[in-house]
């Protein structure tokens, strides 16, 4: 019972405690109701003793009334004050402090007194300042001085919350302070010390505000009933105080925060009255608020601008802190500007309320007076201000300001805190112009006058930033634009931005982030565009921001008034208004052209800020055209309210045009992700030379010139819009937009001229360039319209229509912004793109950057519309305009192509999308599968470098209509930007032949070298791309370079050369292969005449390339020029891609056989020259794939396109080997006439015998030389990697290959050599590509490629005629030094092109830098060395030399050639296998590359039978080391090859056994080669690579069976007795070599 009683007592205590708690909570609730000010003041008072002291007299009474009810309540309050900082001030006021509280208060008395002392002088100053404020309201100077003083006193405190609040609170509480007791002060200090970090921080203080705001609203309603007038005035003061409080919160001032909290409670109590009224009557409330705000704003705007130096730091600090609070402007204006706009009214009320709280009765009375004054003033002010704003800064605005000042004077006087008033005004200004002030105030530090100009600039900048936050997608571009144009548009931009800065303006700011340029631009567009289009966006944004409803926009005056009244509401309604603006802008996006240009211009404007002055000059000239609006904007910008009114007025006047612009900009910005926009803009900026950049740059400055010119040309609303849209983003890239402007056929020359000018000028002055460019751009009105339509989804459709309606002369609308691109990607573009298919085939000048970031979107776009792709580039033009930066330039260039080619060039537009490796791949596949475009519409992206990347995608899209060969190279693209693009377009436009898949120009070079219209898209010389080939990004450049040869011989068949280039080359080797496999099959569907040669994207490139090859299978063997770099990075992927192309080539006659080159670039170029010549003869542009230098001399079209591929065997070795194994198993290829290349010659020697026997040897590319010995050397390494078994399997392969016609001997030499420079001599490299050539090409791909490709190869084997040689090149990644050699060796493959026979031997000399282990890896990923026995093998010498150099350069590289199966029906593979084995041991024996090289030469010189033996014998004499089998290969290796079984038997001693094994094959093959030297028998490096086996078990089994059957088969066929003896000797030699080692 006792326990129970105890527990009961405890329970009673607890219940009592709970009861107390509830009681106190109820009390507290009642207290706020009865005394909301006190409740509010509690937290704030605790945080700031000064503010608490100011309110303490009344608070004490109120607290005594509410708190005496219970001592416990007082105690709890005191405890709460310790934590909440609220009760302690009340205790100080009510003198009801708990024992600990007084101690603390006493302990803090000194601090509070000190702070008070410190604040006394500011207080005195504030009093003086109050007097000055009265004078200041009469004169701005006085106000400026006063605000400077107050801000000087408060700016630093504002920057630091306590300091700023202490002076203010001390100033405001000086009167209060005298009435306060020290405990209250100590409490304030205590609160400030304890709650500074807490309350000063936004969380708690904000929470207090929020918590108090909701209950205070109810309380306010009650209080409003009791004291409506006071509540109204208090609401205003509350708003001001809230703004100040926000600043304080950002400043982390606990004391003032507490006072503000109290003030907020009182103010909030009153605010709800206004808020509910505002909510009930949003327009009325907004108008009232706006009117009041206009009054305060106007006075504050000037004053703030003048003392912006002080407010600078404050605004920045406020931005940082308040911005965090504010969610809307999170990106850049997350700072004070973010928070203030939403809480502007509350802040103003709070700020005003703080003075009212400080001087309770007096302030309330003053507030009432202020309210009375404000209410009449704002109403006339709003109307008058609107009018004055329209007409410019007028005395009426001055009157309004004076009214505001008068209304604020008593308010400020009684508050005695000039800082608060200043802060209030500042916050008001910041709320309206906070973006500008955030940046503007920072910039205004220099001088008060500059403060006006700079704040204006910064208003635009900040509004842009604010808009950024509002539209993060477009935020990034917008800031740049507003920065650049803001400086120029300091006066104009602030105008527009000040009214909109609250929220709506940021959108408009972004739309017209360069307010000046926007205003000018809009005025110009107003002249040219319908007035509704020109300035509507500005007005509409405001209407949307201010009223947040379309109804507000209906009445211009009402809108102005509402905006003035809504300025307060804009803060609360800002998000909604922004949404409304977004919606409206979306509605107006249909006219997005003008908007998109603005949008684009804005991103660029920031970067072009340095160029801002020039832009401002242009804008000033534009202002001259729209001087009334510009001057009004400038003048009104000085006055926030006036500027706002002016903006509204100008909007009402220019609303038709500008409204759509800004809205379109807003919508586009919304669509454009800030990240995307930023990256997109960065791309633009990176490619300033590109036309889209130029256009974008042109847009803002062009507004004046464009007004003049555009009005002259026909006042093209759209061109103006386009210029407007583009210029801000394109300021840096003004050169780009100019280029982009070129695409219009009629204006193409002008655009080209613009590009040339803008490219040169963009860097210097985008403004002047833009002006000149816009003059030109204004001439093609259709394009602007297209841009307008393209800018948004609806606009995109309009754009599409415009293009369709307009002749191809205006096809390219580079005006299309990145946002448009994005929208295109969204799918809006796709619909419009489809509508105008033939009219505008402007090859999108895809910019490298645009390719990367915009490519995803663009690809989607390109995928969707086939014919509309023309418009896509236009839609993308802005992105392409700066060829590298965006597809806008592509659009322009593409536009030109479209104009000339009409429909033919529409597809290149898609290429920018395909530029993205992954997405582009999918896009390419989709486009290919669609195949809507006719082959005649060869998508040859002549327009620009960017356009070239796009052309690939476009080609993929173009598919049948235009097997566009987008040779896109980032580096090359800049070349196309200026004059070259026009010529390219003109040529491609006219030249595009239905068959001739436009070889996507890798840049303007193609255009410059433009050949007959059918070759319009022919890529220029790839030389620049060769340089680009260093990077995977530059693979397209290589492709373009290779394309250039097709340009020289304009053959319709050569149109599409998928340039497997940088993008494909390095970045997505692995993915590329897989994609290429699937796409290759899809391409097969397409007719060969539509060979689509996807450009550089590694993934899509391979896939598209394969597809293009398939398309071209019959008519064109697409020779995807693969750069050495591409070889390196895309080695596997490239190979696969090439394999796919080979497959498509397989469909094509052997003349179309592809030849991947792996030799040094110079050799590749030399060979490529032959190949190109052959390719041109054969009429297959794919041969242009050969090196850039080779491009100069296109080969006959018959020649299979050689794939210049270099790869690092180390990375790709395993994959290559598996690919080779698959290829060998999949594709037996017949040998064609031995290729001229050294490797081809050796392959011919080796394959000549195997070709008659239809034996596919798996030659191991040996660094030893390009001739057969290297293959034997390769064999040993392959033996190390189960090459013994592979060689056993190889006979089977040979047999299988025998089944294939000898025409298609695919000689894929693998270098199983260990990490030695011997590898560079992949004599097995000469492989002939036939139907299985595709498989071989795939073999070129990485292991994954080999895995996926072999299946396709197999299928392609059956599909492709044996006559078509597929030349695969070892894509294995070679050492960087090896790569050039590979390029040299690769040309060997071109020899096939001589006879245009499928067995175009590719001497893919790849020297994988691999050690013995590397050799194993190489064996796994052994790079394929396709070698064809074409009569064209004359190139072998060059390659052999280059190959030797390559070998030397890569001493450690071990090349593991992927096994290529050339099915020489004549020769059994057994001898070849033996030969390889012999060579491989030699390679193993010969660590020195030099010995291998001579051996390879000797082997090449001699038929594989005898000479190779000699070489191997010599090698054996020199180097018994199996790692040096090259020397041993000639004789000893042959002997060891005779001991093929031994080699097979011993994997550990595979080097020795390899030599024997290889020699067996060599010896067996040598007689055959002697008999049929020119019949290149494909040396299939045994697919015994473990990786290959694992990757392709079927291939391994197949190879194993073949190897088992081939040795007997080959000897049975053509193996002479001496060959068998030689095999035995080779085996013995390999063993001897091992022993010697």
Swiss-Prot record:
Residues 229-249, 355-374 have a biased composition (Basic and acidic residues). Predominantly expressed in testis (at protein level). Disulfide bonds: none annotated. Residues 170-190, 341-353, 745-759, 879-896, 935-956, 964-975, 1017-1030 have a biased composition (Polar residues). The keyword rRNA-binding does not apply. Residues 103-114 have a biased composition (Basic residues). Residues 44-121, 141-293, 341-404, 438-759, 865-896, 935-975, 1017-1057, 1090-1137, 1182-1238, 1539-1558 are annotated as: Disordered. It is found in: Cytoplasmic vesicle, Secretory vesicle, Acrosome. GO terms for cellular component: acrosomal vesicle. Keywords: Cytoplasmic vesicle. Residues 550-572 have a biased composition (Acidic residues). InterPro entries: CRACD-like, DUF4592. It comes from the Eukaryota. Residues 141-156, 250-261, 508-526, 689-698 have a biased composition (Low complexity). Interacts with TOP2B. This is Acrosomal protein KIAA1210.
């Amino acid at each position: 019972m006792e326990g129970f009683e105890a527990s009961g007592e405890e329970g009673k205590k607890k219940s009592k405690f709970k009861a107390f708690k509830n009681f106190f909570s109820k009390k507290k609730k009642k207290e706020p109701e009865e005394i909301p000010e006190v409740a509010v003041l509690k937290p704030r008072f605790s945080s700031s003793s000064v503010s608490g002291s100011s309110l303490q007299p009344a608070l004490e009474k109120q607290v005594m009334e509410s708190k005496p009810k219970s001592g416990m309540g007082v105690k709890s309050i005191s405890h709460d004050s310790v934590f909440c900082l609220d009760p302690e001030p009340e205790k100080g006021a009510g003198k009801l402090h708990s024992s600990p509280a007084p101690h603390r208060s006493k302990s803090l008395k000194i601090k509070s007194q000190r702070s008070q002392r410190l604040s006394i002088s500011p207080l005195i100053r504030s009093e003086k300042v109050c007097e000055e404020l009265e004078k200041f309201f009469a004169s701005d100077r006085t106000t400026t001085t006063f605000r400077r003083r107050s801000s000087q006193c408060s700016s630093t405190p504002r920057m630091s919350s306590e300091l700023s609040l202490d002076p203010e609170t001390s100033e405001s509480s000086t009167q209060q302070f005298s009435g306060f007791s020290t405990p209250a002060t100590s409490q304030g200090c205590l609160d400030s010390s304890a709650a500074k970090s807490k309350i000063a921080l936004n969380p708690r203080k904000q929470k207090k505000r929020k918590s108090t705001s909701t209950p205070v609203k109810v309380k306010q309603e009650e209080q409003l009933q009791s004291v409506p007038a006071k509540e109204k005035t208090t609401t205003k003061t509350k708003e001001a105080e809230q703004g100040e409080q926000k600043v304080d919160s950002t400043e982390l001032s606990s004391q003032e925060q507490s006072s503000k909290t109290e003030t907020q409670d009182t103010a909030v109590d009153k605010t709800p009255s206004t808020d509910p009224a505002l909510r009930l009557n949003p327009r009325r409330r907004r108008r009232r608020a706006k009117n009041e705000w206009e009054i305060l704003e106007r006075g504050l705007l000037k004053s703030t601008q003048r003392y912006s130096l002080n407010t600078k730091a404050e605004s920045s600090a406020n931005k940082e802190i308040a911005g965090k609070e504010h969610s809307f402007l999170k990106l850049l204006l997350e700072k004070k500007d973010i928070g203030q706009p939403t809480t502007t009214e509350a802040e103003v009320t709070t700020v005003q309320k703080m003075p009212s709280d400080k001087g309770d009765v007096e302030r309330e009375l003053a507030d009432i007076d202020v309210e009375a004054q404000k209410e009449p003033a704002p109403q006339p002010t709003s109307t008058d201000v609107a009018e004055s704003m329209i007409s410019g800064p007028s005395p009426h605005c001055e009157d309004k300001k004076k009214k505001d000042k008068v209304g604020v004077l008593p308010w400020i006087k009684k508050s005695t805190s000039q800082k608060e008033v200043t802060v209030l005004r500042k916050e008001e200004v910041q709320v309206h112009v906070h973006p500008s002030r955030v940046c503007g105030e920072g910039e205004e530090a220099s001088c008060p006058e500059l403060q006006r100009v700079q704040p204006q600039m910064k208003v635009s900048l900040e509004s842009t930033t604010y808009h950024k936050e509002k539209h993060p997608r477009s935020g990034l571009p917008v800031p740049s634009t507003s920065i650049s144009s803001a400086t120029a548009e300091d006066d104009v931009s602030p105008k527009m931005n000040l009214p909109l800065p609250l929220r709506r303006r940021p959108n408009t700011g972004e739309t017209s982030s360069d307010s000046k340029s926007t205003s000018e631009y809009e005025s110009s567009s107003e002249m040219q565009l319908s007035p509704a289009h020109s300035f509507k966006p500005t007005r509409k944004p405001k209407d949307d921001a201010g009223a947040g409803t379309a109804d507000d926009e209906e009445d211009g005056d009402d809108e102005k008034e509402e905006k003035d009244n809504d300025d307060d509401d804009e803060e609360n309604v800002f998000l909604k208004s922004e949404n409304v603006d977004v919606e409206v802008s979306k509605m107006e996006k249909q006219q997005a052209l003008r908007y998109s240009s603005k949008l684009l211009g804005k991103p660029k404007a920031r970067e072009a800020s340095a160029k801002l002055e020039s832009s401002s000059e242009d804008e000033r000239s534009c202002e001259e055209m729209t001087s009334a609006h510009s001057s009004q904007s400038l003048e009104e910008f000085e006055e926030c309210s006036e500027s706002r009114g002016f903006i509204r007025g100008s909007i009402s006047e220019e609303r038709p045009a500008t409204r759509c612009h800004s809205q379109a900009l807003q919508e586009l910005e919304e669509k454009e992700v800030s990240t995307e926009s930023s990256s997109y803009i960065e791309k633009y900026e990176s490619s300033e030379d590109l036309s889209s950049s130029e256009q974008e740059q042109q847009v803002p400055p062009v507004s004046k010139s464009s007004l003049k010119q555009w009005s002259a040309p026909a006042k093209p609303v759209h061109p103006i819009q386009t210029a407007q849209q583009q210029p801000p983003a394109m300021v840096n890239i003004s050169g780009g937009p100019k280029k982009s402007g070129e695409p219009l056929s009629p204006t193409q020359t002008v655009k080209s001229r613009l590009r040339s000018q803008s490219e040169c000028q963009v860097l210097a002055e985008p403004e002047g360039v833009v002006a000149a460019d816009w003059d030109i751009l204004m001439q093609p009105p259709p394009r602007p319209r297209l841009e307008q339509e393209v800018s948004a989804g609806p606009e995109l459709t309009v754009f599409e229509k415009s293009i369709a309606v307009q002749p191809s002369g205006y096809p390219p609308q580079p005006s299309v912004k990145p946002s448009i691109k994005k929208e295109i990607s969204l799918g809006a573009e796709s619909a419009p793109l489809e509508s105008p298919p033939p009219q505008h085939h402007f090859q999108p000048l895809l910019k490298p950057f645009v390719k990367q970031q915009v490519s995803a979107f663009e690809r989607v776009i390109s995928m969707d519309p086939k014919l509309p792709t023309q418009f896509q580039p236009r839609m993308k033009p802005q992105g392409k305009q700066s060829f590298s930066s965006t597809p806008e330039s592509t659009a322009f260039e593409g536009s030109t192509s479209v104009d000339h080619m009409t429909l033919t060039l529409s597809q290149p537009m898609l290429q920018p999308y395909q530029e993205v490796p992954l997405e582009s791949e999918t896009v390419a596949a989709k486009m290919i599968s669609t195949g809507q475009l006719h082959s005649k519409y060869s998508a040859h992206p002549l327009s620009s470098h960017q356009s070239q990347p796009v052309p690939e995608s476009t080609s993929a899209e173009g598919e049948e209509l235009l097997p566009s060969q987008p040779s896109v190279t980032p580096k090359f693209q800049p070349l196309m930007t200026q004059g070259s693009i026009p010529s390219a377009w003109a040529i491609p436009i006219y030249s595009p032949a239905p068959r001739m898949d436009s070889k996507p120009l890798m840049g303007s070079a193609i255009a410059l070298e433009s050949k007959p219209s059918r070759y319009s898209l022919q890529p220029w010389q790839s030389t620049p791309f060769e340089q680009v080939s260093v990077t995977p990004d530059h693979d397209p450049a290589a492709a373009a370079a290779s394309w250039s040869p097709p340009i020289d011989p304009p053959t319709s068949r050569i149109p599409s050369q998928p340039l497997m280039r940088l993008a494909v080359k390095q970045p997505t080797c692995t993915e590329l292969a897989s994609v290429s496999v699937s796409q290759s099959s899809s391409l097969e569907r397409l007719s060969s005449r539509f060979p689509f040669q996807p450009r550089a994207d590694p993934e899509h490139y391979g896939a598209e390339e394969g597809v293009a090859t398939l398309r071209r299978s019959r008519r064109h063997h697409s020779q995807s020029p693969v750069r050495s770099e591409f070889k390196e990075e895309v080695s596997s992927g490239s190979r696969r891609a090439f394999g796919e192309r080979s497959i498509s080539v397989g469909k094509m006659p052997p003349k179309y056989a592809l030849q991947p080159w792996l030799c040094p670039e110079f050799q590749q170029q030399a060979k490529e020259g032959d190949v190109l010549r052959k390719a041109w003869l054969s009429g297959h542009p794919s041969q242009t794939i050969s090196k850039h230098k080779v491009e100069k001399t296109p080969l006959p079209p018959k020649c299979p396109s050689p794939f210049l591929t270099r790869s690092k065997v180390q990375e790709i070795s395993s994959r290559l080997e598996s690919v080779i194994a698959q290829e060998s198993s999949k594709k037996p290829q017949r040998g064609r006439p031995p290729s001229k290349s050294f490797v081809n010659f050796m392959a011919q020697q080796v394959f000549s015998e195997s070709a008659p026997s239809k034996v596919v040897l798996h030659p191991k590319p040996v660094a030893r030389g390009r001739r057969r010995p290297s293959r034997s050397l390769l064999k040993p390494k392959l033996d190390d990697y189960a090459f013994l078994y592979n060689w056993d399997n190889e006979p089977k392969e040979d047999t299988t290959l025998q089944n294939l016609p000898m025409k298609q001997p695919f000689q894929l030499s693998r270098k199983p050599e260990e990490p030695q420079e011997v590898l560079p001599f992949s004599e097995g490299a000469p492989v002939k590509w036939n139907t299985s050539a595709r498989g071989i090409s795939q073999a070129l791909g990485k292991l994954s490629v080999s895995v996926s490709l072999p299946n396709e190869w197999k299928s392609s084997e059956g599909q492709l005629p044996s006559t078509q040689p597929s030349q695969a090149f070892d894509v294995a990644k070679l050492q960087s030094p090896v790569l050039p050699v590979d390029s040299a060796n690769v040309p060997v493959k071109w020899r096939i092109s001589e006879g245009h026979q499928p067995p175009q031997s590719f001497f893919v000399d790849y020297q994988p830098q691999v050690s013995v282990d590397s050799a194993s890896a190489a064996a796994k990923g052994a790079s394929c060395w396709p070698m064809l026995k074409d009569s064209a093998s004359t190139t072998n010498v060059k390659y052999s030399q280059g190959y030797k150099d390559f070998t030397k350069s890569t001493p450690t590289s071990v090349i593991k050639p992927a096994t290529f199966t050339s099915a020489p029906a004549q020769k059994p593979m057994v001898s070849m296998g033996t030969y390889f084995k012999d060579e491989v041991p030699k390679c193993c024996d010969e660590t020195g590359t030099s010995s291998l090289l001579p051996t390879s030469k000797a082997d090449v010189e001699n038929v594989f039978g005898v000479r190779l033996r000699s070489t191997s014998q010599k090698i054996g004499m020199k180097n018994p080391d199996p790692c040096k089998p090259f020397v041993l290969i000639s004789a000893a290796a042959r002997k060891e090859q005779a001991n093929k079984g031994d080699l097979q038997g011993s994997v550990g001693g595979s080097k020795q056994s390899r030599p024997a094994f290889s020699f067996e094959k060599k010896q067996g093959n040598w007689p055959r080669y002697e008999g049929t030297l020119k019949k290149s028998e494909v040396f299939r490096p045994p697919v015994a690579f473990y990786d290959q086996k694992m990757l392709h078990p079927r291939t391994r089994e197949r190879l194993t069976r073949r190897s088992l059957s081939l040795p007997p088969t080959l000897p049975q066929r053509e193996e002479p007795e001496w060959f068998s003896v030689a095999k035995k000797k080779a085996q013995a030699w390999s063993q001897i070599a091992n022993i010697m080692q």
